Amino acid sequence: IAQDLSFYGHDLYGESRLAELVRGIAALEGIEWIRLHYFYPSQFPFDILPLMHENPKVLRYFDLPLQHISDRMLHAMKRHTTRAETEELLRRIRKEVPGAVIRTTLLVGYPGETEQDFEELLKFVREQRFERLGVFPYSHEEGTYAYERLEDDVPEAVKQERVARIMELQES
């Protein structure tokens, strides 16, 4: 169980050891399948791809909480990745793991999000055709970086309209 599997092993070994862990778990008698949750794109462990392709116990399921695709918004959200890196990650997953199921979550209405940022996100969703997608409106929560430093400047009605537009596109 982890909030971000991408970092497994970095604390003790200075590198990802996720593939090694998953191989060990898959070898255990009685384990029928393994589904890995939450790979943040900035530190994706690419060595897991061959294992997911080769081992039928490891589900070809990727839960990637991308949040946004606009480089400007990714920087504002402190996501430590870029649009180009994200698109390359998705391309590699689909190429190296045929039949992969990719799920993501997106966040709209983050402080400073413009209509142009949102349109870029909408176009990205249209192009990628995720198997599963969730989208949430930004919520100005106490104790967060954005709450302390940024103004919640996107009206709630705009946030809700953006959620609806993305979900309508995803479901079409």
What are these regions (language model features)?
Residues I1-E115:
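Conserved SAM/AdoMet-binding glycine-rich loop
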Residues K57-R60, R72-S172:
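A structural motif corresponding to the C-terminal lobe/cap of the Radical SAM core domain
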